[in-house]
Amino acid sequence: MNQSRRILRTVYLSLFLIGLFMLINDIFSSNILSSKSSDKEVQFDLNKSFDDNEISSVKSNSFNLINKSQDIVVETGIYVATFSTFKGNLVSLKLKNHLNLEKNPTDLINIDRKNETFFDISFDYFVDDLFLYKKIDDFNHEFKAYFKNNGKTYEYVKKYTFSKKDEYLMKFKVTVNGLEDYNLFDFDSYKIIFSSEIERLSDKAKLQYNNYLSQIIYYDNKLKYGKDGLRINNPRWIGSSTKYFGVLVSKENMEVEFKKERGTLKSFIINNVRNKKNISDEFFIYAGPKDNRYLDVFDKRDDNTFGLFDIFFGMSVEKSFWYLIQVPMQMVMQVFYDVIPNWGLSIIFLTIVVRILIFPLTFKGFRATAELSKLQPKMKELQAKFKHDPKKLNEEMGRLYKEEGVNPLGGCLPVILQLPIFFALYSLVNNLFLLRGASFIPGWIDDLSIGDSVYHFGYKLYFVSWTDIRILPFIMMFTQLGSTIVSSNMDLKNLGAQQKFLYFGMPIMFFFILYNMPSGLLIYWITTNIFTILQQYYIKMHLS
């Protein structure tokens, strides 16, 4: 086999593996959990459920209360939180510093207010009136109601405390006290149904973002995904997570159960009240970006308002197999960004640094290819002489390589070496929160975490899943073709049909595969292609 063809096929085998990697990554991401809204099952403790008439009565009363309820808006330095006097729960939580595609604050709560609330508590279904609201101060807000159970009256209080240091965390305290003179509750536990629906997306954003939703739990120093039937005692935290945001709940001595109901996986936080005279439970809720700059402050007591430590919210950021390569890459990108605050330029500079670092290997590989090309006449003679004896041909080829001091695979090493680098950078660019909403060229590449766009269709083309007209995939395709031609040393006029497909068909195929990839990734790929073209011209001049 012609050595140039061997190298060319190695290149495209690498591209195939890249495409396969991205396909598997997308399939895995999109199938972690498919979640949808549904009516909540009315439930008080682990052993009791309501009949249909009771459920109907509760829902009818709830509908009337919703119509009479008022919204309470609380604004902090980072949040715009909206509470409802119906159930005293959060109905909207907007992040002021993190905008969506429409340049509005991202709303982390994505619920149908008529059917559910963000944090459904068993006691809520016994409250037949609206909650009373009291503003204690700018950071503390209280909702109070009363309910009866088995002839006994209870005072029911929900208190929300926001951080004074604008941390993405609030303390949620549930208090239940009996008003009559009796000792213990006559129930063993109560549940909190934690809504899995987070991050409200517009129709346009749903088309642009590969925004998988997953329910996660951290216990035994491991991040796990929720599944039907899983029940864990005393996890460090439980949460719902999208690609860039998370809502995580931590509480001492809680029990968590995942249960699939009506096709939807739900999270239940079970709280034991056996042998208690009153209830006073505190939950710490992180609601914000999946960014370790914000998540890790709750691992050291002195770093946060609430004095929390060893919560490990930072473990909610999924780490890929290539994490050890990603860390120095991100550090280099951050250095460039600190000098020139543009993440697109940081990706370009990082790519150049990587290419310079592997240049000695690239040069060695190209020199091996050039030396091997000089052996073409002798190789053709051997091929003609032993065309009917493949075993003898291989022996003679091996002897020729040894005598001439040539490694026939030397030109393939740089291509193979780039694979882990590419995979690491793909995972970095595809998941790094800092690239979300980061503009490179305003009006064209406005968000490095999604594809570039010069025209938005408003719908998805059926056959190719395109939502926009994009320019970067075309640039990538042509620069990839140029890079391959320059690197291969092949005579285009003498190419067979198979080789022509490798040259022209594969870049076109990868044009479709990469069309909707994040623009940050395509910037890396294009920069690599251009650098490779210039590098090969330099090497050819040097060797000549």
Curated annotation (Swiss-Prot):
One of the GO biological process terms: protein transport
Gene Ontology molecular function: membrane insertase activity
Transmembrane segments: 13-33, 343-363, 409-429, 461-481, 506-526
Cellular component per GO, a single term: plasma membrane
CDD domains on file: 5TM_YidC_Alb3 (cd20070), EcYidC-like_peri (cd19961)
Keyword Chaperone: yes
Keywords: Cell inner membrane, Cell membrane, Chaperone, Membrane, Protein transport, Transmembrane, Transmembrane helix, Transport
InterPro entries according to UniProt: Membr_insert_YidC, Membr_insert_YidC_N, YidC/ALB3/OXA1/COX18, YidC/Oxa/ALB_C, YidC_ALB_C, YidC_periplasmic_sf
Record's subcellular location: Cell inner membrane
Pfam families on file: 60KD_IMP (PF02096)
Primary location class: membrane
Membrane topology: Multi-pass membrane protein
Function: Required for the insertion and/or proper folding and/or complex formation of integral membrane proteins into the membrane. Involved in integration of membrane proteins that insert both dependently and independently of the Sec translocase complex, as well as at least some lipoproteins. Aids folding of multispanning membrane proteins.
PANTHER family noted in UniProt: CYTOCHROME C OXIDASE ASSEMBLY PROTEIN COX18, MITOCHONDRIAL (PTHR12428:SF65), OXA1 (PTHR12428)
Annotated family: Belongs to the OXA1/ALB3/YidC family. Type 1 subfamily.
Subunit and partners: Interacts with the Sec translocase complex via SecD. Specifically interacts with transmembrane segments of nascent integral membrane proteins during membrane integration.
UniProt cross-references to HAMAP family, sorted A to Z: YidC_type1
Name the record gives this protein: Membrane protein insertase YidC
The organism of origin for this protein: Borreliella burgdorferi (strain ZS7) (Borrelia burgdorferi)
Lineage of origin: Bacteria, Pseudomonadati, Spirochaetota, Spirochaetia, Spirochaetales
